[in-house]
From Swiss-Prot:
Species annotation: Staphylococcus carnosus (strain TM300)
Domain of life, per lineage: Bacteria
Keyword tags: Cell membrane, GTP-binding, Hydrolase, Membrane, Nucleotide-binding, Protein biosynthesis
Subcellular location(s) of the protein: Cell membrane
Lineage: Bacteria, Bacillati, Bacillota, Bacilli, Bacillales
Annotated protein name in UniProt: Elongation factor 4
Entries under PROSITE patterns matching the protein: G_TR_1, G_TR_2
Amino acid sequence: MNNEERLERQKNIRNFSIIAHIDHGKSTLADRILENTKSVETRDMQAQLLDSMDLERERGITIKLNAVKLKYEAKNGESYIFHLIDTPGHVDFSYEVSRSLAACEGAILVVDAAQGIEAQTLANVYLALDNDLELLPVVNKIDLPAAEPERVKQELEDVIGIDQDDVVLASAKSNIGIDEILEKIVETIPAPSGDPSAPLKALIFDSEYDPYRGVISSIRIVDGVVKAGDKIKMMASGKEFEVTEVGINTPKQLPVDELTVGDVGYITASIKNVDDSRVGDTITHADQPAEQPLKGYKKMNPMVYCGLFPIDNKKYNDLREALEKLQLNDASLEFEPETSQALGFGFRTGFLGMLHMEIIQERIEREFGIELIATAPSVIYECILKNGDKVIVDNPSKMPERDQIEEIYEPYVRATIMVPNDYVGAVMELCQRKRGQFINMDYLDDIRVNIIYDIPLSEVVFDFFDQIKSNTKGYASFDYELTGYKESNLVKMDILLNGDKVDALSFIVHKEFAYERGKALVERLKTLIPRQQFEVPVQAAVGQKIVARTNIKSMGKNVLSKCYGGDISRKRKLLEKQKAGKAKMKAVGNVEIPQDAFLAVLKMDED
């Protein structure tokens, strides 16, 4: 293909993604677009086609972004190439959304006709506007009995400033309005601007590892052309490779001769090391490099850390490999080795949030067959010591002693909660209980309120989302962003079993709640830890001070069962022997702790 043909083809390319709050019908709309452009054989069609992980199907959510090429014959008689980049909707995966948007010129904004605009809808709209994308608004699920499309159109105009005439009314499930959406994509979303004769610039927006072909990078070509056999260079790492294959996803991978401006496809170059093909990097030609790399997207830093330990200690190296492979597709996952007296060798692992943590744990157990014990998650605290040093604490067991600490700071988030009028009181009470500071409240219309609070991340991270949902019968929606650190009166609480500290059960708590948290936890552990041959005291301590204690009663073993009748001194001898044996056992006392006990630290708020 010469440059004129490439430029001609470029005019008919449209790159877009679909953004929406979780459950507003994004994956169903993607399915309908695939069907109506005849991109997928009817026999291959299945619900949530782009959600390729079993886990995504089971939970009905999108976790990984996915890119496909579609062909569309428009009503004006021209043939168009669409690249649809599917994105997740859950707040934990917002970095996946920002990666998808960096590869597009436009976005379809899907809003549920019954639910209206929700917190994450807004968060995603702001992301799209930051990337200068054209928005194509769609009100979905208009055939639901509870649908109020006119109210939602008005809301889109009032809250986001979208002209009501531009809104398409649709129902992805019933295939209503899909043809209009396809025509609107052609009309409203601009063609890619780029120069096929300029030096190559391609953005890596995703990558996966294949044991035979090495790293497969998903790329969007911004300038230039790339073919198999080209020598390429990664601009961030400076490493050079030879391209072995370029191709497109239809959703299956299909090799092609070349990728040019506006194309979204994949590239393989026998890259064996994960770090050499980092998401957000720019690919250029080794012999004629571009001067400036593309603006990547901001790296997402983990918000939550927890320890992952293999139940079978021999699988430590397998766990390292599993984490390395997952890290390739998931730039936000971080891990480093850690040892625990209670659990042996494992990794301190950083995640974006609790859903992200659950998904990674489930993937390790399913895809790599490694059974795990996870410790209670914690956030990152900053301690200023009396000697002026600053210490970052991502693991409660590393917290310096209280008498060395001058000040402790903890991360706060700005939480935006959209809630129906009737539940405002319940939500505000929950936020106060979670040490929240009230910032603002606006009425979006006569039924919905937007409440803004600053809340410590440690209070939000565990089950705040579930509690908001249960306090509002599932009607509230929630989004948050990190705002910075604030000074706080925090203490480290240790749990002692049989007089020994269990490092994996330590946690950091606000001083005001230390007593009740400690009391609730020891009571809970009493029910979770199986009874031993000897009595086991369970204590919660802050520094040297014990704030709560309970005992796990011993299992009585009847040593006299074999002693029929006979002399009392014989019975006494057996009982004395048992007593001595128990004392010895208690001295070496090794208490088996089940996995539930480590998670009990999280569940205290529910009591």
